[in-house]
Amino acid sequence: MALSQGTKKKVCYYYDGDVGNYYYGQGHPMKPHRIRMTHNLLLNYGLYRKMEIYRPHKASAEEMTKYHSDDYIKFLRSIRPDNMSEYSKQMQRFNVGEDCPVFDGLFEFCQLSTGGSVASAVKLNKQQTDISVNWSGGLHHAKKSEASGFCYVNDIVLAILELLKYHQRVVYIDIDIHHGDGVEEAFYTTDRVMSVSFHKYGEYFPGTGDLRDIGAGKGKYYAVNYPLRDGIDDESYEAIFKPVMTKVMEMFQPSAVVLQCGADSLSGDRLGCFNLTIKGHAKCVEFIKTFNLPMLMLGGGGYTIRNVARCWTYETAVALDSEIPNELPYNDYFEYFGPDFKLHISPSNMTNQNTNEYLEKIKQRLFENLRMLPHAPGVQMQAIPEDSVHDDSGEEDEEDPDKRISIRSSDKRIACDEEFSDSEDEGEGGRKNVANFKKVKRVKTEEEKEGEDKKDVKEEEKAKDEKTDSKRVKEETKSV
């Protein structure tokens, strides 16, 4: 698979301004506020000018039950802090209570997280973007009928199911400090998804992710687990990540990538015990990007929230091939980043318990497993099911410019004019002003229109010919 450096990618980004309002409860380490901090930081770095920003739709219960059980989703829809006493048995059954508390707006929070990931997958499927980013997603512990590890709905599994409608093989990569157990479990018996997790192992949540857990049935050898010890640093992580992922890409040959960028693997995380810097963490994003595959980037863990915001802002810049200064711009949460007010963090002096011998031994065992794979398994593709999120981009172009658009339509629009507008003395910054662009389109000369009409007729004829050819090839393939 050809690698290439520095090719500019089209990036889209999903964010809803309400996501930072959800609150797991006093003393709970999971703070959705970190997503708002990330968003505010990347706005003040000016990164919004270089990507398309979308508000995610709220995923429906029907979308969620493409993976989760009906009764579990019905329970999540129904339970509230004021009616918990009526659901005590179900709370126990669905593991909701301590780690996964009931809080105000719980189901809406799940809808936004899932909506961004599923919509990202649809965008990638339609080749409308190269990279899609949803920092509200990445909730990798949720099971089919159970909440786990602060996660309720597994947006990753739902996004991968969407990608599988168009892609024969999808690779899932997890660099959160915790094992990506919910995603591995969902695809444990299939050869169409390979899950690769680099995580702390041994008396650590969730307790899964042993080197010997390799998948089952058709999925045997399609689960890859790299168990790690405390204190891994940038150098050691890069020394294992690059060769393992190179071998995975060579043997599995996926056509799409989902990268879970949990930031609890950073040095100084409140719940973590690794020693990665933001640059070391982001090297994984940089490397996966060189494979030039459609990529979905998701959030995940991360409990020292100032560092989560730093990390995901920097990784957004990496996705955009954009250099940003180490000096943090003034932003709404500036005081959180003291005393240094810098983007990058230093590693601590903790001991790296991952010796070179240990890492090499695990790596060689994984290579042996990967050699057991058939090169790029063949998959018989079925008719493509309907997309979970309907693409309404065509409707916008047909709107009457003199008519006021509906609230629903404006919500689907890229960004929000007030929040992302440039000041008058700023340059274009690579952003398209949709209204002006349409205005210019309307003032095309008649000659240009005629020329385009002729061109359209030719293209239509060409498309018909190609369609006939492809139909004939399909029929021949069927008969074989």
Swiss-Prot record:
Compartment annotation: Nucleus; Cytoplasm
Listed InterPro entries: HDAC_PDAC, His_deacetylse, His_deacetylse_1, His_deacetylse_dom, His_deacetylse_dom_sf, Ureohydrolase_dom_sf
Acidic residues bias spans: 417-427
GO molecular function, one term: protein lysine deacetylase activity
One of the protein's GO biological processes: heterochromatin formation
Bias (Basic and acidic residues) ranges: 401-416, 443-480
Record keywords, A-Z: Chromatin regulator, Cytoplasm, Hydrolase, Nucleus, Repressor, Transcription, Transcription regulation
Gene3D superfamilies in UniProt: Histone deacetylase domain (3.40.800.20)
Enzymatic reactions: N(6)-acetyl-L-lysyl-[histone] + H2O = L-lysyl-[histone] + acetate; N(6)-acetyl-L-lysyl-[protein] + H2O = L-lysyl-[protein] + acetate; N(6)-(2E)-butenoyl-L-lysyl-[protein] + H2O = (2E)-2-butenoate + L-lysyl-[protein]
Source species, domain of life: Eukaryota
A Pfam family annotated for this UniProt entry: Hist_deacetyl
Active site: 141
Sequence segments annotated as region (Disordered): 387-480
Family to which the UniProt record says this protein belongs: Belongs to the histone deacetylase family. HD type 1 subfamily.
Name of the protein described by the UniProt record: Probable histone deacetylase 1-B
